[in-house]
Amino acid sequence: MGLVAPSDREIVRELEDHGAASLWVGGHVASPNPTPEAMVWLARLVEQTERAIVGTATLLLPLFPPALVAKQIADLDRAAAGRVALGIGVGGEYASDFDACGIPIEERGSRTNEAMELLRAFWTGEPVTHHGRHWDFDGLRIHPPPQQSGGPPIVVTGRQPVAMRRAARLGDGWMPYLYSPERYARSVATIREEAQRIGRDLDAFTWCAYVFVSMDDDRDVARTNAVHALGGTYRNDFSEMIDRVAAVGTPEDVTAKLDAFVGAGVEHFVLCPIGPNAAENARHLVRDVARSLDRGSPTHG
């Protein structure tokens, strides 16, 4: 089981000591909500941990030059002794992210695909010559390479079929968010079908799910907290959909929902506790719920 890392370094260490398999950070450049920048906080997390996989969930890849991302991740992977995973997405929820970085929002898909291919090439440590739609390089070398052979795993995040196809073609894993178990199962089928169509073996592929969690002994309190938290983040009314897209309720309710995700094909959770008791929820999840649910972590090499 993995968790979104809290900002408090002592809680981060406590979660790792209690057996969190992975810890994740995400962020935006210029969203309406106050959020960190993913790569900066990933560097912080590398220094705060010793054993857990550390990753981004999510780095908005089209906002950044792929050579820079390749260099940053290679350096962090060596600093973390090969514990880094890279969760990437196209973004688009907030046009302000793209305005801030001078990137046309309509190019986010093509930039992401090209950048993913370039990351793999740069992580060999060999000179890269590339003439694509968005970037041109002649013999550009990013070195030394990451500690993990071939580079850290790239886990594709998203919700739509185009993201599923990206995962099937270019990713090492799939991590949707705001999904029900039923929708997750359908996404697994779609990715497998696309992989079969292109002749790709998914034996080493990691099936992840990013799940918001609001837990309380009072089910109504947990639900109210979740609706308020997600409504503030996504500027939407979650009152009708919260039970589908989050794990909400008593500890037993949350365990049942996560069990349903496991039945739908999830191998590794990235759980994001929300609400006023998020820190205590994180402790309870990693101490108690994880024992029956942790199915590995998204790394290779």
Question: Residue ranges of each PLM-predicted region?
Answer:
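Hydrophobic faces of well-ordered beta-strands that scaffold small-molecule active sites
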Residues: 1-3, 23-25, 53-57, 84-88, ...
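Active-site mouth loops of central-metabolism enzymes
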Residues: 1-7, 59-67, 149-159, 213, ...
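N-terminal beta1-alpha1-beta2 module of alpha/beta enzyme domains
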Residues: 1-49, 54, 150-152, 272, ...
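Flexible, glycine-rich active-site loops centered on histidine and acidic residues
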Residues: 1-4, 63-129, 177-178, 182-189, ...
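Short, acidic/polar
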Residues: 5-15, 72, 156-166, 250-260
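Acidic (Asp/Glu)-rich catalytic clusters
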Residues: 13-17, 42-51, 73-83, 168-169, ...
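Alpha-helix-loop-beta-strand connector modules within alpha/beta enzyme cores
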Residues: 36-56, 111-118, 122, 286-301
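Conserved, mostly hydrophobic/aromatic
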Residues: 45, 76, 119, 154, ...
